């Protein structure tokens, strides 16, 4: 019984250490694709969606 508890505790410590190492090594730039610096079409679509959402919200009241 005591050996099983020690093994479980050791496994828990190893898992916690592995997770903390993964958090320390995380990079926010990982996996990003090249984005077009001209974001005007995206801004236009975002504003258009907002306008339509406001219209729909106004109709439901």
From Swiss-Prot:
Annotated positions of the Pyrrolidone carboxylic acid modification: 23
Principal place of residence: secreted
Domain of life: Eukaryota
GO molecular function annotation: hormone activity
Cellular component terms per the entry's GO annotation: extracellular region
InterPro entries assigned: Adipokinetic_hormone_CS
Localization per Swiss-Prot or TrEMBL: Secreted
Keywords: Amidation, Cleavage on pair of basic residues, Disulfide bond, Flight, Hormone, Neuropeptide, Pyrrolidone carboxylic acid, Secreted, Signal
List of residues that carry Tryptophan amide: 30
Leader sequence residues: 1-22
GO annotation terms (biological process): flight behavior; neuropeptide signaling pathway
Protein purpose: This hormone, released from cells in the corpora cardiaca, causes release of diglycerides from the fat body and stimulation of muscles to use these diglycerides as an energy source during energy-demanding processes.
Known partners and oligomeric status: Adipokinetic hormone precursor-related peptide (APRP) can form three type of disulfide-bond dimers: p1 (alpha-alpha), p2 (alpha-beta), and p3 (beta-beta).
Protein family membership: Belongs to the AKH/HRTH/RPCH family.
Name this protein carries in UniProt: Adipokinetic prohormone type 2
Species whose genome carries this gene: Schistocerca nitens (Vagrant locust)
């Amino acid at each position: 019984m005591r050996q099983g508890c020690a093994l479980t505790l050791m496994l828990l410590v190893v898992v916690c250490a592995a997770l903390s190492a993964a958090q320390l090594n995380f990079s926010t730039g990982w996996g990003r694709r090249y984005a077009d610096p001209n974001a005007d079409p995206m801004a236009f679509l975002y504003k258009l969606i907002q306008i339509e959402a406001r219209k729909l919200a106004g109709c439901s009241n």
